[in-house]
Amino acid sequence: MNRRQVLTGLAALPLLQAKPDPAAADRSSSIDFDPWMVRKLARELASKPYEAPDSSLPASLNDLSYDAYRSLRFRPERALWRAENLPFQVQFFHRGFLYKNRVTIFEVADGKARHVPYRADDFSFGDVAPPPDSDLGFAGFRIHAPLQRADYYDEVSAFLGAAYFRAVTKGERYGLSARGLSIDTGQSSGEEFPLFKTFWLERPAPGASSMVVHALLDSKSVAGAYRFTIRPGDTTVFDVEMALYPRVDLQHAGLAPMTSMFLFGPNDPADTPDFRAAVHDSDGLAIFNGSGEELWRPLCNPKDLQISSFGDRNPRGFGLMQRERSFANYQDLESRYELRPSLWAEPIGDWTDGAVKLIEIPTREEVHDNIASFWEPKQPLRAKGEHIYTYRLHWGPDTPKPKGLARFVRTGVSARGDNDRLFVLDLAGDRLKTVDAAAVRGVVTADKGEIRNIVTQPNPAMGGWRLSFDLAQARAPVELRAVVCEGDAAVSEVWLYRWTP
């Protein structure tokens, strides 16, 4: 079972009950629409008690296997806007398997919202026989646009399951996912999974380079309104505007959340023999903090749940990155991990005090997402209030931030006895090409144990530099910090790492 099936086929929520209720309108008619309407609906929804979902389906769809569900395919020739030859097309996901919740979808054109009707003959069902004349509804949708070439509509984004969505860019494959909101992620009380329950898809103009999606979110603790402006390209960009209306105080709200997978890599090798040297959708967390400091934290597959917190004020950006881009370091012809996108979240406006959180969960299989990252405000999001945030998501091979400093591109760890470790860090970047080699030095600190044998030297095999050091007498989890300097001036980002025996 795929990890995204596990994570996204979760909480299913009821259809919108607020009045006016566009989902309850005559489905052959249209209603007036403006973007503020979604906020009004979310605010009204939050003022009412939460209602548990009704996700009932006929047995033929409720009990599907993963492979059987995959046979439920939307017919591409029936795609929304295909006949109009517009720059975007939309195909829909059928309900079934883990995706039992119905989402209501509207098309918006000329200020009017028209319900997109479910028609069974829009799908091919394989061996699954749907009940005749049933309005079974949709589980989600995917967006297609010319990405690789002008005469073919590639899949560029998908919204399916809970509040999950993902995207790709030119030359890449799906990898990590984003979410509309996370609640209590990593908390002992258990996580709550909000759900996008209604979508409004704005019809793009001929020649448009972007598409707008509005969404209504609901869960036990909060309702919310979202506006996504989606621009596919060499980097696929989502401009996200969200307004949250909590029913209760949200102590642990995760903003701009993202989830990924890290099974093993050079810093955290596989426990059992594997023909691949690395298996991961992301290999590190990058942070550009409010003080202008650039941080890099390689990911791990820990023995126990790990939660890391990077306190900040008005962060400039953070994201789960896939820096290793060489097939030779993965050797997986099927998964092609070197083609998985990175995801960078760029806050816009004042996000005040809080922390970038990193959650690392033990896993034995690559089919499970075990990495999560998000921004958690220091102050709770209070009930009965309106909390507005704007940010930009960049899906692509790299971050959009300047590359003035050298970057750590590989972290290797070797055992030296029971409690000692050798760390070997490789760096790359144009900044290293102009340094005075005699003045280059590594600065390494640890909150426990002892740092020995710090060596900084050119790495001609990769056109960069290498920093190595020993961590000695370390018997407890150790927080490490390293930076490469030319004299007293940093020429690299800051490398952070938690070593656990």
Curated annotation (Swiss-Prot):
PANTHER family: GLUCANS BIOSYNTHESIS PROTEIN, GLUCANS BIOSYNTHESIS PROTEIN G. Belongs to the OpgD/OpgG family. It comes from the Bacteria. The gene is opgG. One of its GO terms (cellular component) is outer membrane-bounded periplasmic space. This is Glucans biosynthesis protein G. Its main location: periplasm. Involved in the biosynthesis of osmoregulated periplasmic glucans (OPGs). Pathway: Glycan metabolism; osmoregulated periplasmic glucan (OPG) biosynthesis. SUPFAM superfamilies: E set domains (SSF81296), Galactose mutarotase-like (SSF74650). InterPro entries: Gal_mutarotase_sf_dom, GH-type_carb-bd, Glucan_biosyn_MdoG/MdoD, Glucan_biosyn_MdoG_C, Ig-like_fold, Ig_E-set, MdoG_OpgG. Keywords: Periplasm, Signal. It comes from Rhodopseudomonas palustris (strain ATCC BAA-98 / CGA009). The lineage of its organism: Bacteria, Pseudomonadati, Pseudomonadota, Alphaproteobacteria, Hyphomicrobiales. Residues 1-25 form the signal peptide. Pfam families: MdoG. It is found in: Periplasm. GO terms for molecular function: carbohydrate binding; catalytic activity. GO terms for biological process: beta-glucan biosynthetic process.
